[in-house]
């Protein structure tokens, strides 16, 4: 990339900036959950909605982001994304109640949903095709650093300042990024087809109300009748989308995608798999602080080995899949993650704290292998004309399943514990033990889906070829 003009390199730095902001925010909040609960006068069992409100909003808004960038221009949308994300951060810091915080997190989610996909689109437009992979590697590297710094930085800020600062640090960064975007980024636009607004609204309503219904009376305080009404509305919305998309070439996501068996299996496995693994980033720091009495900073540091294991495994995952095939790798890593989850719970409750970093490192390795395998399996056999739509649907399902996973984790804590779980409670560790056992069971379930994947290792050569072209 050394032969790129200075203006293009600056534009890549802006995109990398956005990737870093978004990825940092996905992990920095987790460590602060117990402190937020204490400050806002809420039970920690209700605080999972702080994560769900953000991730669910990202899932809902993702399908519209690419179309908006093509229609309005990448500079305008990227600038808007940074401004919304920064304003959301400010409102989060100013929140005095849980409901105010949830609304502010949703505003953050709107900005976050546009930031990453529009950033990818920007790179595609400003960089020659032969340098696209190198440019994407450059701009996504800060996105890999964000999850590494997030837990420790969040714990440090909570312990030595207050939880408000995990949001306030976004404000100067966002202001600089917004100004740089206006000054340095060109406003590329493209001719767009008509946006499937009807399909978008049906999917958005279906995803949102079903997630709220799942949270139920424990989190939202809804009556059984209201929950039943939400379920009915959500199911009807999704059924209407299926009818809307049938034989509709302009549908948001074509049903032709599901004619590819590996896509159908991969998407189902990704949805179920990320429900289980989506619980872990929320539950681990909460358990370390409330269940074991760790300080916020110490709990944040404990998350770093998991991220390091994930980053390290990415270097060899291609060879592993090529050697053993998708079916064996996905079944083994799914069951392995369930066992590692049980191992983490056991070592923690036995007080073997010096073993926990190694267990978390192993958890990161297994999880990374499974994620990479699921993503590639889902997309590898799609025809070129459906690849972009399939990738967008996968991205949306990833966010949706993670929000559902965090919701279920909160429900499990509420099911096994009282409304006032705290470090001083004598039953707290028992509550967490039953929750971790249930999580391990849920994490293992997708193995039944992955067992149906054709064990055709010859097709895995496609991953290796893509990997080499990226280097």
Curated annotation (Swiss-Prot):
Membrane disposition: Multi-pass membrane protein
Pfam family, one: MFS_1
Periplasmic face of the membrane: 1-12, 70-76, 125-137, 186-196, 246-262, 307-341, 417-430
Record GO terms (molecular function): transmembrane transporter activity
Main location: membrane
Transmembrane segments: 13-33, 49-69, 77-97, 102-124, 138-158, 165-185, 197-217, 225-245, 263-283, 286-306, 342-362, 396-416, 431-451
Keywords linked to the UniProt accession: Cell inner membrane, Cell membrane, Membrane, Transmembrane, Transmembrane helix, Transport
Entry superkingdom: Bacteria
Residue ranges annotated as Cytoplasmic topological domain: 34-48, 98-101, 159-164, 218-224, 284-285, 363-395, 452-471
A GO-annotated cellular component: plasma membrane
Protein localization: Cell inner membrane
Family statement: Belongs to the major facilitator superfamily. TCR/Tet family.
PANTHER family xrefs: BLR6921 PROTEIN, MAJOR FACILITATOR SUPERFAMILY MULTIDRUG TRANSPORTER MFSC
Protein known as: Putative multidrug resistance protein MdtD
Designated gene of the protein: mdtD
């Amino acid at each position: 990339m050394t032969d790129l003009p200075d203006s293009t390199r600056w534009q890549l730095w802006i995109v990398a900036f956005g990737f870093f902001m978004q990825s940092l925010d996905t992990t920095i909040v987790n460590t602060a959950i117990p402190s937020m609960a204490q400050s806002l006068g809420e039970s920690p069992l209700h605080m999972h909605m702080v994560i769900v409100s953000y991730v669910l909003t990202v899932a809902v808004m993702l399908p519209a982001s690419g179309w908006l960038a093509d229609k309005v221009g990448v500079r305008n949308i990227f600038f808007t994304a940074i401004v919304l994300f920064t304003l959301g951060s400010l409102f989060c810091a100013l929140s005095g109640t849980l409901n105010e915080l949830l609304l502010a997190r949703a505003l953050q989610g709107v900005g976050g949903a546009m930031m990453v996909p529009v950033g990818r689109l920007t790179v595609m437009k400003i960089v020659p095709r032969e340098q696209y992979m190198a440019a994407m590697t450059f701009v996504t590297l800060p996105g890999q650093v964000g999850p590494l710094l997030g837990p420790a930085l969040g714990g440090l800020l909570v312990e030595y300042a207050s939880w408000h600062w995990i949001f306030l640090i976004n404000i100067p960064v966002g202001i600089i990024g917004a100004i740089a975007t206006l000054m340095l980024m060109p406003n590329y636009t493209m001719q767009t087809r008509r946006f499937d607004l009807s399909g978008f609204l049906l999917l958005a309503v279906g995803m949102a109300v079903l997630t709220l219904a799942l949270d139920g009376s424990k989190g939202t305080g809804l009556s059984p009748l209201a929950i039943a009404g939400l379920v009915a509305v959500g199911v009807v919305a999704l059924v209407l989308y299926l009818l809307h998309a049938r034989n509709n070439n302009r549908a948001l996501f074509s049903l032709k995608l599901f004619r590819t068996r590996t896509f159908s299996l991969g998407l189902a496995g990704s949805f179920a798999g990320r429900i289980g693994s989506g619980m872990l980033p929320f539950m681990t720091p909460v358990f370390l602080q409330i269940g074991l009495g760790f300080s916020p900073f110490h709990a944040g540091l404990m998350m770093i080995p998991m991220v390091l294991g994930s980053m390290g495994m990415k270097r060899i995952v291609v060879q592993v899949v090529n050697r053993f095939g998708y079916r064996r790798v996905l079944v083994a890593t799914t069951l392995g993650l369930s066992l590692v989850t049980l191992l983490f719970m056991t070592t923690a409750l036995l007080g073997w704290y010096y073993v926990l970093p190694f267990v978390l490192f192993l958890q990161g390795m297994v999880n990374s292998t499974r994620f990479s395998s699921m993503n590639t399996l889902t997309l590898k056999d799609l025809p070129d004309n459906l690849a972009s739509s399939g990738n967008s649907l996968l991205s949306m399902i990833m966010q949706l399943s993670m929000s559902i996973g965090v919701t279920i984790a909160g429900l499990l804590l509420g099911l096994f514990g009282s409304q006032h779980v705290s470090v001083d409670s004598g039953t707290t560790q028992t509550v967490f033990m039953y929750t971790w056992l249930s999580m391990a069971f849920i994490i293992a379930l997708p193995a039944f889906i992955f067992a149906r994947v054709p064990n055709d290792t010859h097709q895995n050569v496609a991953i290796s070829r893509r990997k080499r072209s990226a280097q």
